[in-house]
Amino acid sequence: MSKIIIPENYTPALNLYDTQRAIGTVKRLFADTLCATLNLYRVSAPLFVEASTGLNDDLNGVERKVTFDTKDSGIEVQVVQSLAKWKRKALKDYGFRVGKGLYCDMNAIRRDEDMDNLHSIYVDQWDWEKVIREEDRNEAYLKNVVRSIVSAVCATEMNLHAMFPQLQDLPLHTPNVTFITTQELEDKYPDLTPKERENAIVKENGTTFLTKIGAPLKSGKPHDGRAPDYDDWDLNGDLLFWNEPLQCSYELSSMGIRVSPESMDRQLTAAGCDDRRELPFHKAVLNGELPYTIGGGIGQSRLCMLLLGSAHIGEVQASVWDNATREACEKAGIPLL
């Protein structure tokens, strides 16, 4: 059974019909605003990639990928878990220049996801990637992009409230962002777990960008797992918002400046993944054949949850839930799609 939290006195702000209208509105408005802000262009995205290319996202390195072989060729393919590495290659293949980028509507299956109010085995997100200069690989550039994304969220929210007056009782988010490193967070809350630290900082400060995820902290453990072959662990982070119905923080976006040849070399060794060096994607990065980029994924259902004040991700996306979860939600008046 998936884990579930039933908030007290929770009532959805919109009925099912208006929820569907609002979901479409959020996806259209936010994508348009994000593209204008970051100079992105939409491209078509694959649902699966060849296993031998190394293009699939390994996430934390333990999640099983949905894999099958094709009838005609027998090639082994994998349903994508994200497009983090595919996008960087696509920027080169499609001829994108510095200052321009792409985004796509990414749909993924994560079979090993621990399902709860915020997590589903079905993942839908805007996957985006942008070509940058080598000198843009710094914290100031990363923070400016984070602020742009948060501003796009706030602009979408303002327009949504104007179109759906039923949402006007929900608190509006501000464009203010707190930036803190994982080590600073551990130092601030040494007796809390990583998730408890996130809850504490976001409850205290609101929207927070937690930086430098992947490398071990002074405690000897990383704040969270990160694959060694796309984000630079010194130039990445998670964008966290506060979920009012659930009274917890949650990640809207994981993003970062991507690995250089030097940082990929270090991170592959640190993670014990030197065997990946011969994969086509990894060889291209290590040989300096791919552009410097920044990118990330922004959860579509997560953003809809945030702006509609939803208590369960199943209110804004159609997925599979066990009977106990469906019965508990129905009893509590939480309508799952």
Identify the meaning behind each predicted range.
Residues S2-H119, D127-V131:
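Class II aminoacyl-tRNA synthetase-like tRNA-binding/catalytic domains
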Residues D18-T25, L29, R137-N144, S148, ...:
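Generic recognition of stable, solvent-exposed alpha-helical segments in well-folded globular domains
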Residues F30, L34-Y41, I149-L160, A311:
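A generic secondary-structure signal for well-formed alpha-helical elements
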Residues L47-A51, P165-L172, A324-R326:
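A glycine-rich phosphate-binding loop feature that marks nucleotide/adenosyl-phosphate handling sites
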Residues F68-T70, K92-V98, L118-S120, D169, ...:
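A general structural signal for short secondary-structure junctions and capping/turn motifs
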Residues K100-L102, V123-D127, N205-T207, S249:
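Extracellular structured ligand-interaction cores
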Residues C104-P194:
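Extended, charged alpha-beta segments that form solvent-exposed binding/catalytic grooves
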Residues I109, I180-L337:
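A translation/RNA-centric and nucleic-acid-associated enzymatic feature enriched
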